[in-house]
Every structure is written in structure tokens, then in C-alpha cells.
Amino acid sequence: MIVEAILDATPLPAHAFPAVADAPSAGVFAIRHTVSERETSALVPHANNIVILGWIDAIASLHGAHAGAARADLATAGRMWFVARHEVDYLGEAFAGDRLILATWVEKLGRTSLIRATRILREDGTALTRASSRWALVDLASRRPTAIPDGVRAALVGAHG
């Protein structure tokens, strides 16, 4: 999966991207991304659903790192986010050279899991993808859900560009 460029992206300040219709007024984390040729399919030259899932995962990872809860740090502490569910609406296509905004925020925070919203849109505001994902924090030794630490909870809800 080609997500290295996303993982090195700089967060955007809230005023630097188009309004996302259903996003909260605060707590949105967003980056710019230009679709590369390597991210498109050979048979149908657009970013396919597997690449888009990679973008959803990458923006979640970057948001966590920006909030002080990087995956490497979680793994060192014996924890990791596991996806329990992705629900993705594909609203339009992305092609090589398209300049996109990837935005994410925490919609609901439970004791051991959260619901994360992700939107992918063109810079002109055209919506391409709407996703909702449930992520569970899992203890790596027991492979069971574990409580989200208060510091991580506060950071994820408050982290935005």
C-alpha cells in the first residue's frame, strides 16, 4: 500500500480546507494529499477501494501520532488500535494528480473503543468518500479490548491541525 506520503504529511489548520458538511466545529484533523500514479489501478485508472482504505488507516494513524498516541508508542506499551468495523460510502473517483483533503475526527468515544469519521474530498470541496470506523484499543498480550487511557482520550478529541 502506498501511504508513505500521507504519513509524512503536515496537518492543515482548520481555515485551510473546505468546510465538511457534517464535521464538528473543532477537533477535525486534516491533511492534503496528491494522488500518485502508483495509487491508481492499472485496469481502471483511479484510486481503488483498497487504496482508499489505506488512506483511511493512514489519516487515523497520523491523527493519533499528532495527538501523542503514535502506534509505535502504543505497541511499546503493549496496546494497539484494531479496526472492528469500516463503513465506507464511495461518492466519487480520485485520479492521478487529484489534490485531495483527507479529514478525520472522533465522533464518539467509549471506554475501550471509538467511532472515527473520515472524509475524503477534492480541494474544491467535492466529496469523494464518507467513512465511519470503529476502532478498539486492544491489549496485545490478552488480545482483549482495554480501557483507553484518559490522556489518549483527551488528546484524540482535542487534536486537530
Label every PLM stretch briefly.
Residues 131-133, 149:
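Short hydrophobic alpha-helix segments
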Residues 56, 118, 131:
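Conserved GNAT-family N-acetyltransferase fold
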Residues 63-115, 128-130:
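Hydrophobic beta-strand-centered segment that forms part of the acyl-chain substrate-binding groove
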Residues 109, 121-125, 136-140:
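Short coil/turn motifs at secondary-structure junctions
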Residues 91, 119-122:
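Core beta-strand residues in small-molecule sensory/regulatory alpha/beta domains
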Residues 127-128, 145:
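A structural signal for beta-strand boundary/capping segments at domain termini and interdomain linkers
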Residues 2-83, 140-161:
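Hot-dog-fold acyl-thioester-processing enzymes
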Residues 32-36, 89, 134:
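Generic structural detector for well-ordered beta-strands
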